[in-house]
Amino acid sequence: ENVLEEQPEMMTEIFREVDNPRLRMCLDVGHVNAYSPVPVEEWVSACAGFLSHFHIHNNDGSQDTHCAPGEGTISMAALLRQAQTLCPEATFTLEVLQAAPAVSWMLEERILEG
């Protein structure tokens, strides 16, 4: 899992070096938004070949606040579509402080359908 890494290459280099299909990456999109100057969408594109799991939460980009997906600066619906396209087998953990707003957002955006 990425925590304070500023560039996706900091993670992809490790996975390329180890070169083992059993070692997969968890992308914490809130950490990317708070700690990296690289947009989350670029991280997904750069790391797609190694990604198997995502931690989903949002923030305003200044700190890791674990807000609901619809409450922050990440365009979460677009990001989840990108993740489903590039990493169709990936799983997701909703990592928020309050579940109700997150579930409401997922229902409104029809994230759980399909």
Each model region followed by its residue ranges:
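Conserved glycine-rich "GG(E/T)P / GGGxP" loop and the immediately following alpha-helix
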Residues: E5
